[in-house]
Amino acid sequence: MSLDNFSKGALAISGETTLLYQDIARSVQKEKGIKIVNFGIGQPDFPTFQKIRDEAKKALDGGFTAYTSAYGIDELRAKIASFLSSKYNTNISSKEVIITPGAKVSLYLAFLLYVNPGDEVIIFDPSYYSYPEVVKMLGGKPVYVKMKWREDTGFSLNLNDLENKITDKTKMVVLNNPHNPTGMVFDPKEIDQLIEIAKSKNLIVLSDEIYDYFVYEGKMRSVLEDPDWKNFSIYVNGFSKTFSMTGWRLGYVVAKENVIKKMSEIAANVYTCPTSFAQKAAVSAFDTFDDVKKMIDTFKKRRDVMYSELKKIKGIQVNKSQGAFYMFPYLGEILRKSGMSTKDFSVNLIKEKGVVTIPGEVFPLDAGKEFVRLSFAVDENVIKEGVQRMSEFINQLMRS
């Protein structure tokens, strides 16, 4: 038996590809001493709000450091159930909530619960790159539905193609709204239509709503607003983005009670429980929405700055982000003239100008192959400097 003889599931997946570009940036900074402008960041740059930190200290000092239930602490489950019930005018019991060590674990539990080898999971392209990786690890098959893009309106869900891709092996559709990497907030009518398709075909909708408070334009539709949500959906969210708690690793799932019970059985055998004192602190997060609003207002200003700066660059087509904290400009003309792929573009931009962007072709197939993702989770002055460097780099490409 060789330690190099990995399982089929392990061999089916690759690492987090965005980290590659962070590694290149670190090397460039070390070798050339260039100040790095990091538009590759997928987390808010705000510290966790003071009240949450204070409650964590209080929990630690009070000795709240033992195991909890695999479901998570009752106080936090009840808080989430009450909050979402009020927000979406629905009825959620605390028994329909499980706390997890991050929204990624929530997604993993959902996939693990339903995906058998050979099952198909529909994933929109572009989308967050981890979705298909976990499906492949479990022996499932990601089936990609290419989103529609228009220069004037940006990306939208291709529901006709979605229907055409459904087979008797299709188990689930993955929805992310607001959307990473495109920054779209999908039209509520599109979401309603997707839900109706899923219901008619007896499919599960796995809805990743981690960016639900990062909405600058339009109205976000949650699956929990559908009166029949318990019969078709698994809702995933977490504390990382809204409350700037990425390192705390806390997420949660809302689903009908027997689904949550089965998830808790998996949890008990995989990670036992989420961190006790982090859960205790997270209860207070729901009292920090004044801080959340200030953060979102700041992000909206940053979005406006990045959009206006990118619009100045000849050859770029950019739609103003409606949600999340990403801009996803189209570089087709620049790439054709330079002979580069977006991966080439991103690597060379780091090496020559010290600016990190993430190539669209990693999200996760090819619908984003002429786009790059830029995060505006950085200071406005940093945005201006980074886009200026990017402009200089593009001008050099267009002249050569």
Swiss-Prot record:
Residues noted as binding L-aspartate in the record, renumbered to the chain: 42, 180, 373
Modified residues annotated as N6-(pyridoxal phosphate)lysine in this record: 241
GO CC aspect terms: cytoplasm
Class of this enzyme: transferase
InterPro entries: Aminotransferase_I/II_large, AspAT/PAT-like, NHTrfase_class1_PyrdxlP-BS, PyrdxlP-dep_Trfase, PyrdxlP-dep_Trfase_major, PyrdxlP-dep_Trfase_small
Matches recorded under PROSITE patterns: AA_TRANSFER_CLASS_1
Subcellular location: Cytoplasm
Entry-linked CDD domains: AAT_like (cd00609)
Name of protein: Aspartate aminotransferase
Taxonomic source organism: Sulfolobus acidocaldarius (strain ATCC 33909 / DSM 639 / JCM 8929 / NBRC 15157 / NCIMB 11770)
